[in-house]
């Protein structure tokens, strides 16, 4: 590819807040689209205040989710400003993406039906909470709610202890990614037909997507899975073990890997025992096998086990903390942590992709509230 900005020439209007829609907008912007973020003039996106840490008075979280964008303010309670936004969309936008509560844009005359009628080439992307239909359609939603309601939290934590949530906004971020996938598919279809259309994604649907394996298993056998801490229901051993100086992850995901694991830890006979021969046997006899392995791993430090397991080709990893992750030689080699040398000085995680070996560079810092009003909105008046 000749460019790391393949979406150059596209214009995206993002009426987004918090994480999901802004993350989608950030991806599109880093890939070259002109993304115009629309905020309420009375404080803007609440994410601006999600700190500490703050950089020049704005939360680092806002910079992470809103780089590569221009910024304007529109008061949706002001008909004149709404009309200005509508003209901006109709004149310039290829894509509109929003995550306001269901029906909000309809009330202000910015419905999908109206805008796609006025501009048939527009791709109108709704990033919802529970989806665009059903009894929960009108409910608001945040990432923790979806981890709970969609069953993800029922799988996390130790058996017999309270459920826990994934500590990052995995549902929000993944919904942003699905939104980008859907938008790009709609734009590809527009290449053939000349028409845009309406794209719907939601936090709840994303959660169900993450739950593909456990839901499929339940539909097959009717059994509700138990919580296994760092492990999973279908594979054993596939979890973290305590060593003499910390925890490490061990993933013997096949019968062959299990046999090699047993040799590496000095217990080759374990793999020959009928109760542990196949993965299905090990799943049934998890409570017998895991304590045996746990006792063995406690006898030596992580470095010793890592050397033995690496030599045997067994996937394994220490449980790294963030200070270790950001200074890890592999992280450095990938160049995924990018610096902005201007003002404000920032270091953020870049897009996790490359084109012909080149990663899209840090395009632009997040906009100040309304910083592009004069150039962008006022021209539509």
Question: Could you say what each language-model-derived stretch is?
Answer:
Residues 1-182, 186-195, 339-340, 364, ...:
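N-terminal helix-loop segment corresponding to the beta1-alpha1 unit
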Residues 75, 98, 201-204, 250-252:
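Active-site-adjacent beta-strand anchor residues
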Residues 35, 310-324:
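Short, well-structured beta-strand/strand-turn elements
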Residues 236-312, 316:
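Aromatic-enriched alpha-helical interface/lid elements that frame and gate functional surfaces
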Residues 42, 130-131, 203-208, 245-247, ...:
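Glycine-rich beta-alpha junction loops
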């Amino acid at each position: 590819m000749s460019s790391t900005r393949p979406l150059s020439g596209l214009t995206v209007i993002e009426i987004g807040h918090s994480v999901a829609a802004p993350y989608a907008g950030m991806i599109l912007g880093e890939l070259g689209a002109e993304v115009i973020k629309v905020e309420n003039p009375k404080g803007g996106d609440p994410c601006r205040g999600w700190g500490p840490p703050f950089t020049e008075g704005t939360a680092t979280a806002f910079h992470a989710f809103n780089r590569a964008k221009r910024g304007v303010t529109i008061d949706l309670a002001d008909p004149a400003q709404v009309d200005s936004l509508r003209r901006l969309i109709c004149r310039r936008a290829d894509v509109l993406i929003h995550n306001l509560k269901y029906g909000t844009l309809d009330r202000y005359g910015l419905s999908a039906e109206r805008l796609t009628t006025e501009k048939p080439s527009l791709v109108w992307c709704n990033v919802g909470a529970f989806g665009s239909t059903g009894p929960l359609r009108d409910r608001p939603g945040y990432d923790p709610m979806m981890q709970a309601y969609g069953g993800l939290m029922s799988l996390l934590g130790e058996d017999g202890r309270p459920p826990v949530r994934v500590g990052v906004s995995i549902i929000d971020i993944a919904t942003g990614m699905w939104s980008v996938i859907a938008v790009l598919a709609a734009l590809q279809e527009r290449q053939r037909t000349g028409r845009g259309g309406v794209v719907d994604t939601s936090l709840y649907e994303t959660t169900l997507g993450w739950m593909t394996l456990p839901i499929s298993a339940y539909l097959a056998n009717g059994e509700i899975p138990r919580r296994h801490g760092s492990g999973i229901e279908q594979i054993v051993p596939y979890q973290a073990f305590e060593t003499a100086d910390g925890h490490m992850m061990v993933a013997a995901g096949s019968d062959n890997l299990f046999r090699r694991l047993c040799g590496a830890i000095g217990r080759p006979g374990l793999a020959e025992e009928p109760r542990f021969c196949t993965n299905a046997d090990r799943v049934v006899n998890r409570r017998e096998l895991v304590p045996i392995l746990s006792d063995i791993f406690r006898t030596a430090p992580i470095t010793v086990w890592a050397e033995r397991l690496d030599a045997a080709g067994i996937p394994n990893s220490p449980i790294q903390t963030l200070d270790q992750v950001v200074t890890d030689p592999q992280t450095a080699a990938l160049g995924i942590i990018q610096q902005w040398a201007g003002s404000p000085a920032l270091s953020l995680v870049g897009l996790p992709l490359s084109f012909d070996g080149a990663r899209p560079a840090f395009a632009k810092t997040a906009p100040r509230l309304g910083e592009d009003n004069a150039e962008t909105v006022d021209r539509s008046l």
